[in-house]
Amino acid sequence: MATITREEIKEAIKSMTVLELAQLVKDLEEEFGVSAAAMVAAAPAAGGAAGAAAPAEEKTEFDVILTNAGANKINVIKVVREITGLGLKEAKDLVDGAPKPVKEGVSKDEAEQIKKKLEEAGATVEVK
């Protein structure tokens, strides 16, 4: 039996249609007694379909997004520097480039605290 490299397998898969890929998945599931659905659930950050299923679970990581600096931009820059540890130029660029994430992947409590600080400084903020 000839040995096929992983690269050759990847190239063959790239050339397949969606229907052929679906049939290949079914064949592999039957051959090895596994389920592709279990693999998708184990890696929710892998793609768009897995990301669509995630909202059913309670969210544990949040992104704090500065949508508008408001009229008191200097105070907002100071708060952004305090929260992120960025330098003056980087913090100013972040504030000037709004809407931009200030902090990503934080707990709900931390996200709410950051939002409160930024809003007290005059910024418009949303937590996603």
Swiss-Prot record:
InterPro entries: Ribosomal_bL12, Ribosomal_bL12_C, Ribosomal_bL12_C/ClpS-like, Ribosomal_bL12_oligo, Ribosomal_bL12_oligo_N_sf. Keywords: Ribonucleoprotein, Ribosomal protein. GO terms for biological process: translation. It comes from the Bacteria. One of its GO terms (molecular function) is mRNA binding. One of its GO terms (cellular component) is cytosolic large ribosomal subunit. Pfam families: Ribosomal_L12, Ribosomal_L12_N. Forms part of the ribosomal stalk which helps the ribosome interact with GTP-bound translation factors. Is thus essential for accurate translation. NCBIfam families: L12 (TIGR00855). Belongs to the bacterial ribosomal protein bL12 family. Homodimer. Part of the ribosomal stalk of the 50S ribosomal subunit. Forms a multimeric L10(L12)X complex, where L10 forms an elongated spine to which 2 to 4 L12 dimers bind in a sequential fashion. Binds GTP-bound translation factors. This is Large ribosomal subunit protein bL12.
